[in-house]
From Swiss-Prot:
Gene3D superfamilies, per database record: 3.90.950.10
Name of protein: dTTP/UTP pyrophosphatase
Organism: Clostridium botulinum (strain Loch Maree / Type A3)
Function of the protein: Nucleoside triphosphate pyrophosphatase that hydrolyzes dTTP and UTP. May have a dual role in cell division arrest and in preventing the incorporation of modified nucleotides into cellular nucleic acids.
Catalytic activities: dTTP + H2O = dTMP + diphosphate + H(+); UTP + H2O = UMP + diphosphate + H(+)
Cofactor: a divalent metal cation
Amino acid sequence: MKNIILASASERRQELLKRILEDFQIIVSDFDESSIPFKDNIPSYVMNLAEGKARSVGKKIMDQDSNLVIGCDTLVAFNNKVLGKPKDKKDAFEMLQALSGNEHEVYSGLAILDVKSNKIITDFVCTKVKFSKLTSLQIEKYINTGDPMDKAGAYGIQGKAGVFVENINGCYYNVVGLPLNKLNSMLMEMGVNL
């Protein structure tokens, strides 16, 4: 069996991967996300970011055999504008206010790199999420929990912001940060059967 490495510091991704895989390593990527400019194609952008993360970790372990590195990047898009992690509370408020009462998309790019052969596969998942109308007080109370500050789009569906979600169309785990169904099919393509 190949050693599987998750190129992510995200606790959410680690928890999700543990649901389908008992044994894996974590090596945090030092990939500079700003090195890839956004050019209006969100699926391509998230796949390039995921590949950059996987290759960054792959370079660190080139001398080891039988390693597969999983890279992932998740972002929120609204009106074809990328909403990353908020810079501050004001930014978080503006993001949540924009999402209030509207539908947005959550994209995750996935990349799996076979370090020995240098073979890489990439794919993406898009999930549509509709928020109910939020009051300013709801948004402020949520921001004051600190929860939105490390999350794309300034919310985590698996936490207190779950009550904001009116409906979801697509993979729930994608919105959390790691689309398990797509990851499973990609691992199978790389010869790993869970």
